[in-house]
Amino acid sequence: MSSSSNVTSLPRLTTAGGVFPREMVRVHSSCNILRSKAKVGGINYFNPGNIKCVEVHKSRQVAVAAVKSLEYETEKPTNQDVVSEKMRVLSERIGTMLQNMNEGEISISPYDTAWVALVEDTDGRPQFPTSLEWISNNQLADGSWGDRKFVIYDRILNTLACVVALTTWNMHPHKCNRGLRFIRDNIEKLENENEELMPIGFEVVFPSLIEAAQKLGIEIPHIDSPCIKKIQAMRDFKLKRIPMELLHKKPTSLLHSLEGMQGLVWEKLLDFRSDGSFLCSPSSTAYALQHTKDELCLQYLLKAVKKFNGGVPNVYPVDMFEHLWCVDRLQRLGICRYFRAQIKEMLDYVYKYWTDKGICWARNTNVQDVDDTAMGFRLLRMHGYDVSTDVFKQFEKAGEFCCFPGQSTHAITGMYNVYRTSQIMFDGEDILADAKNYSATFLHQKRLASELVDKWIITKDLPGEVGYALDVPFFASLPRLEARFFLEQYGGDDDVWIGKTLYRMPYVNSDTYLELAKLDYKKCQAVHQLEWKSIQKWYRDCKLGEFGLGEKRLLLAYFLAASTAFEPEKKGERLAWAKTAFLVETIASQQLSHEQKREFPNEFEHGSSLNMENGGRYKTRTRLVEILSNTVSQLSFETLVAEGRDIKQQLSNTWQKWLKTWEEGGNLGEAEAQLLLQTLHLSSGLDESSFSHPKYHQLLEATCKVCNQLRLFQNRKAHDAQGGISDLVIGTTFQIEASMQELVKLVFTKSSEDLDSITKQSFFAIARSFYYTAYCDAGAINSHIYKVLFENID
């Protein structure tokens, strides 16, 4: 058939560059596999599967114009511009928030404000009159003080503290009476409240507050009730366990609740201040100021009262906490790519104050906790900062881990973050291996007992967060899969933290983040759904179903690509990944004789060569070879248009290597990983010098090794399942985990002469996709595919 036969006329195409001349474009209408063909630099490029197929005999610019014009013709009108503008506004708003981060945005605590209001100046007057004013102005309609989230521990503690402060200064007796009425009507509810919702130190400070109220002549209703007696007994038990000599010997978490203690030796305790405060606690520091008149304590409180216009938070500053948890939320919501510069600044800030013992919620503190330390370690390591596992030593004793050294109880979220951190261990990091075993066991037990209620946060779906972490380990957690689940688990503005009182962190829990994340997800999902239709068309036009694999396998291939390289601008990489993976599986599934296998790569090689030499008129004897050749041409053409680079010969050579391995019965998992990686890198326009970089070869070797292990493991699982063996070991193997740890170390560590982070991450992305399919069962995978690609976001 001549190149001019069966050509239908095409109207002139209007492009951004003007009118596209009719004589430059011809549309073929009689091919089994429709083609667009562009002759650029003397080479014909085929594009199988297009609705309209263009043969262009001009420059690359002309080819680009034709493709863009045809794409424009098939676009449907959408509200894309409106959505894009909304996303731009939200991104700018969030960017401004992140740039303005300082010592932490946090809500005010009536309890701590009351303790500050109790401080006298040298003349016996209120040292902080604006704190009394804040109390007066912030009583709730029911007579209580506290967060809008009703937790009886929080409301009773805040309300009694404010009543004590106002009564001390003989102010607003009617407000005091309303507060006491609230206490009388609600105090017995303490009996039935979940103890996990009890604020930090409540059992110590609440009885002390009752005693202070009684000294003022305030009658506390139901003082002899069982719930009050129980709390007092808890206080006595805890104080007996506190070695006072230890309290005065070195900094401990007890510095946070000094207002609930007796017999303190202030001369010794003053040595434990940090930035003028006792563990960043305004109430504890105010109590110290009452007894010592210490100038540094005064300056700390003056600064806090000024910043918060009379009120004070339950803890301040919270800069390390805010920086880290903000980065974590942005990452898990899938929108961190919009804020790379700000995230680097935030992590640089954290690293500046990182210590060999870990960190706490604020910089320069003399006490560390495992929750902030684990979160910091995890994020810093994942972004290439050099951090040592020695920071966890003080939190471990005989294989058990605690939040503060010597503490016996655990918070769910503390162990949850230890567990998440333990999964990015490098080979040989035994303390993280111990942390993983301990935290995983703890979380599994809590889940089985339906006790996933945290003592540090009231969040929308903590059981869902913990369940996802346990069911989908880090090595299997595809980025878009994690984001899709977290969009449902993240509560935004409604999430509230538990400290000495309930408090909120607007730069950590934000509806603005959630709104942008949902818009971003919907935008990406819409792109993915259109691409899925186009790849289905490719499958049907090529009649690939005749080779034995259904669209379900194609959908899995596309899901893995779209869940990893999900950004709209990565269309070329997604389609190249999905089509390559599916063709690999299709070819490998064919029952061919040794002779047929030997002919296949030869025919592909000669067919590819002839296609380039004679305009594509060479007809291969094997239709599958023809489909492969045309797909390679299509992917090459699309990369030429997008990146301005001719990759056809390199892509053909990469396929030849895989076909040779397949023909010889070699390690197909290893060969497939190499094929996918090089296809991705070629399609993305990766600089050619990167392919010869020493680190590239290290990463390629490590990735191919673990992918081969995973594919063998997956095949064995499938074989065992077919044989009726159902009691498979949960997880993978020690060798696989060690190989993944080796790869993770190469990806997450930086060297003086290194590849860029995005390229290194692509190796982990391919390994992760192999791990995912090897680890997750078919039912889970099917539900994930539906959820990520097709389920609507509310």
Curated annotation (Swiss-Prot):
What is the protein name given in its UniProt record?
Ent-copalyl diphosphate synthase 2
Residue numbers of motif DXDD motif?
A: 369-372
Question: Which GO molecular function entries does the Swiss-Prot or TrEMBL record give?
Answer: ent-copalyl diphosphate synthase activity; magnesium ion binding; terpene synthase activity
Keyword check for Plastid, yes or no: yes
Transit peptide extent? Answer: 1-35
Q: What is its EC number?
A: 5.5.1.13
Task: Give the domain note.
Answer: The Asp-Xaa-Asp-Asp (DXDD) motif is important for the catalytic activity, presumably through binding to Mg(2+).
Reactions catalysed according to its record: (2E,6E,10E)-geranylgeranyl diphosphate = ent-copalyl diphosphate
Keyword line: Chloroplast, Isomerase, Magnesium, Metal-binding, Plastid, Transit peptide
Q: What does this protein do?
A: Involved in the biosynthesis of ent-kaurene diterpenoids natural products such as oridonin, miltiradiene, eriocalyxin B and nezukol, known to exhibit antitumor, anti-inflammatory and antibacterial activities. Catalyzes the conversion of (2E,6E,10E)-geranylgeranyl diphosphate (GGPP) to ent-copalyl diphosphate (ent-CPP).
**Is Magnesium found in the keyword set?**
yes
The UniProt record gives the binding positions of substrate as K238, K455
One Pfam entry name: Terpene_synth
Tell me which SUPFAM superfamilies the record gives: Terpenoid cyclases/Protein prenyltransferases (SSF48239), Terpenoid synthases (SSF48576)
**GO cellular component, as recorded:** chloroplast
Q: Which GO terms describe its biological process?
A: gibberellin biosynthetic process; miltiradiene biosynthetic process; terpenoid biosynthetic process
- Which residues take part in binding Mg(2+)? D369, D371
Q: In which tissues is it expressed?
A: Expressed in leaves.
The organism encoding this protein is Isodon eriocalyx
As cofactor, the record names: Mg(2+)
Q: So what family is this one in? A: Belongs to the terpene synthase family. Tpsc subfamily.
Pathway, per Swiss-Prot/TrEMBL?
Secondary metabolite biosynthesis; terpenoid biosynthesis
Q: Where in the cell is it found?
A: Plastid, Chloroplast
Primary location group: plastid
